[in-house]
């Protein structure tokens, strides 16, 4: 996202159907371009805009279940034939409501142990990120084409290279070698993908970090802003009130996720604490995720109550 000069509030959509919004798979011949209820989504987006939201964080390729063609070696060979059509649809819906999109290219589930459902592999792609040849194929055949097509599109407010990579980085968020890659490999992916972006896009580039305590994983890799997440379980080691200047980052910070359910702090309190700490914005979790951290009505009430946005 192009960071505004003053504090802003955004929203994690984060998907309409996890892994199924962009590209074809066993469940649908396409993603959003063949969605059965576009009017419902349009109404939802208008509601977000009416509450002052200008940017939505949207997961694109997720765990690799759709949108990417893989070769016999398990490495990417390119985007499938409907991805661009689906992205065009997403951006069109957002534009009509006056929203911009922050695409999240990959989720950490990309690296989790593979599962097969209805003949579709979910996850199990960690070698793509751990091996130099896999990273090169991913960036050249999947990520670069997205940057080239949408890198100057004003409806795209930024690019998130991977969501919460710490959970699959050995020695950072996990010690399970079966579902992780080495720290140097993850840093290489982020560095190379950021360099690819800077050669092709005008929007800023970021990574959704699981916690501010792990920002060291992504520092010094060419990101344009840092995007730590905050949940109550991290409070003891990464307090929400910690001043941004104490984190010694060379770029601005945006609070990329915070819970709207199950937290000791109400959404409006989190937003004001983030503002006071020096963040440039905060994006609540979430609008449509069906999980214990999501309460969209609670978020709406907080915004309607007058959380100041500029």
Task: Name the predicted role of every residue range.
Residues 9, 57, 249-310:
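Substrate-binding cleft of secreted/luminal carbohydrate-active enzymes
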Residues 229-234, 283-285:
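His/Asp/Glu-enriched short active-site or ligand-binding loop at hydrolase and phosphoryl-transfer sites
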């Amino acid at each position: 996202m192009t960071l505004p000069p003053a504090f802003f509030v955004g929203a994690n959509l984060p998907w309409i159907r996890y892994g199924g919004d962009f590209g074809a798979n066993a469940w649908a011949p396409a993603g959003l371009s063949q969605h059965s209820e576009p009017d419902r989504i349009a109404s939802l987006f208008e509601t977000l805009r009416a509450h002052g939201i200008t940017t939505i964080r949207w997961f694109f390729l997720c765990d690799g279940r759709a949108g990417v063609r893989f070769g016999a070696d398990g490495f990417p060979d390119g985007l499938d034939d409907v991805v661009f059509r689906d992205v065009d649809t997403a951006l069109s819906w957002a534009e009509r409501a006056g929203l911009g999109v922050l695409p999240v290219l990959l989720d950490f589930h990309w690296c989790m142990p593979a599962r097969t459902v209805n003949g579709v592999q979910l996850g199990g792609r960690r070698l793509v990120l751990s091996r130099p040849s896999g990273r090169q194929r991913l960036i050249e055949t999947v990520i670069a084409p997205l940057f080239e097509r949408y890198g100057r599109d004003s409806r795209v407010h930024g690019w998130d290279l991977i969501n919460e990579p710490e959970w699959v980085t050995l020695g950072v968020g996990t010690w399970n070698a079966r579902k992780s890659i080495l720290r140097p490999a993850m840093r290489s992916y982020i560095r190379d993908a950021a360099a690819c972006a800077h050669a092709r896009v005008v929007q800023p580039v970021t990574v959704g970090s699981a916690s501010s305590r792990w920002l060291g994983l992504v520092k010094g890799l060419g990101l344009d802003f840092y995007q730590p997440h905050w949940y109550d379980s991290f409070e003891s080691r990464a307090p929400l009130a910690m001043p941004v200047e104490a984190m010694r980052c060379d770029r601005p910070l945006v609070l990329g996720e915070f819970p709207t359910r199950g937290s000791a702090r109400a959404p409006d309190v989190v937003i004001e604490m983030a503002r006071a700490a020096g963040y440039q914005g905060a994006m609540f979790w979430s609008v449509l995720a069906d999980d214990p951290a999501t309460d969209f009505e609670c978020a709406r009430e907080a915004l309607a109550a007058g959380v100041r946005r500029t």
